[in-house]
Amino acid sequence: MKKLFVMSFTVLFSLFLAVPAFAGEEPQNLDDLSNLGEIIYQDDEITVRDFGNDPVISNIITEDPNSVIAEENAGIKPQVVGPGGRAVVTAGDYGRTIYWTVRPNTLWPYHFEGKVKLRYYSGFKRDAPVGGMGALGSSLSGAVHMNKNNGGYATLTGTAYSLDFSKYKVLPGAGTSF
C-alpha cells in the first residue's frame, strides 16, 4: 500500500512540474498553434508536436468549425457514441497540420499513447506516434505537421491508461480530411 501511495504521489507531482512553457501571448486560433509546443518527433516528411494539457489549446482545437468530435453528445458535429471520453481531430494550415486533443472520462492522472494515421490519396500510408500525460480530468493536445500535403485522411487512435488501472480507448470515427 505504501509503495502504491508513493508511486501515485510521485506521478501526480511530476505531472505538475512538467507543464510546457509557452510565450506570453495566448494563441487565438489554429494558425497561432503552428510553432507552439515541444517537438517530439521530426523527419523529412512530418513534425509531431506535443502541446501538453493546456486547456486554452484544447479549446481552440475543439471550437474550430472544422473539428470532428467523437463523444456521446457532440451536438451538430459528427458523433460516435462510447464511454471512453472525448477525442477531437481537425486540419489546419491549409491541410498541412493535423491538430488533435483527447480527454478521457477519468478524474485520475493518465498516460495517453496513440497514433495519427495518415492515409494519403496516392496510397502512401504513414503513422505518427502521439501521446503524453494528463492529470485530474484535463485534456491532452498535439499536432502533426506535414511538409507536403498531397491530400488524404487522418485518423486518431489510441488508449489512455489511468492510475486506477482503467483503459479509455479513442472512439472510432475521430478523423478528418486534409
PLM regions: where:
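Mature secreted bioactive peptide module from preproproteins
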Residues: V68-F178
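N-terminal prepro-regions of secreted/extracellular proteins
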Residues: M1-A91
